[in-house]
């Protein structure tokens, strides 16, 4: 659920369809149409300039290939440009961003996505998930997600998919169903199935110092057990 392998299709250019990696799982979890409406940010801007810089970096300056593959250079770029910002966001210092939908989305991206780049393969990469989840739930409750583009909404809902709660996974399925992208919904269903079976993501166990059950150990040997 964190960073799947490189998509052959995206490595050669943009794509509007899901491709399968060597594990048999989608190499890039989300499908984004080539239309700028799905890749570019909204014409409106976040009121806070720093929040807007996050939106611009993620949706205008970065690509799906960078979003969903392990890329040391991309991780380093985020660390250099936004590392201090991530530390501040983790302390809850950017409540002022929540005055508009894009500002709220920027805070979610910093906590839910940048954390996975900057703190990759460490427990800290998941430490901000509860805060990200609450921000997503609040965004939905206020109806502010409805004013975002499809790709923006997909990232707004990612904390639901990252959750190890069966209840929250149900909400993830509802939101990705409403979003109307069958490929994205399929990926959400794959996440939900793992949580329904294990109550957690087994591929996180080693990073978080959790012991595998015998069933989890067997599962981790199968294709598609990790995201």
Give residue spans per PLM region.
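Ser/Thr/Pro/Gly-rich low-complexity, intrinsically disordered segments
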Residues: 6-7, 15-18
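Residue-identity detector for glycine
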Residues: 12-13, 21-24
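Intrinsically disordered, low-complexity activation-like regions
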Residues: 43-105, 110-121, 126-227
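Aromatic (phenylalanine/tyrosine) cluster motif
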Residues: 30-32, 38
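Short, intrinsically disordered, low-complexity terminal segments
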Residues: 6-8, 24, 30
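Short, positively charged and aromatic/hydrophobic N-terminal segments
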Residues: 22, 37-38
């Amino acid at each position: 659920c964190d960073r799947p392998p490189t998509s052959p299709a995206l490595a050669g250019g943009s794509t509007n369809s899901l491709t399968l990696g060597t594990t048999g799982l989608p190499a890039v979890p989300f499908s984004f149409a080539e239309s700028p409406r799905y890749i570019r940010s909204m014409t409106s801007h976040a009121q806070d300039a720093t929040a807007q810089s996050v939106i611009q970096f993620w949706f205008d300056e970065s690509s799906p290939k960078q979003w969903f593959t392990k890329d040391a250079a991309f991780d380093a770029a985020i660390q250099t440009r936004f590392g201090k910002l991530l530390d501040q966001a983790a302390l809850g210092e950017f409540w002022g961003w929540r005055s508009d939908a894009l500002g709220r989305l920027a805070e979610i991206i910093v906590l839910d996505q940048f954390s996975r780049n900057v703190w990759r393969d460490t427990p800290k990469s998941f430490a901000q998930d509860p805060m990200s989840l609450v921000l997503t739930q609040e965004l939905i409750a206020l109806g502010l997600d409805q004013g975002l583009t499809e790709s923006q909404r997909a990232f707004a809902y990612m904390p639901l998919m990252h959750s190890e709660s069966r209840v929250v996974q149900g909400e993830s399925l509802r939101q990705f169903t409403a979003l109307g992208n069958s490929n994205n919904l399929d990926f959400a269903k794959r996440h939900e199935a793992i949580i329904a079976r294990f109550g957690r993501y087994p591929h996180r166990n080693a990073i978080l110092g959790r012991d595998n059950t015998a069933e989890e150990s067997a599962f981790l040997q199968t294709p598609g057990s990790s995201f």
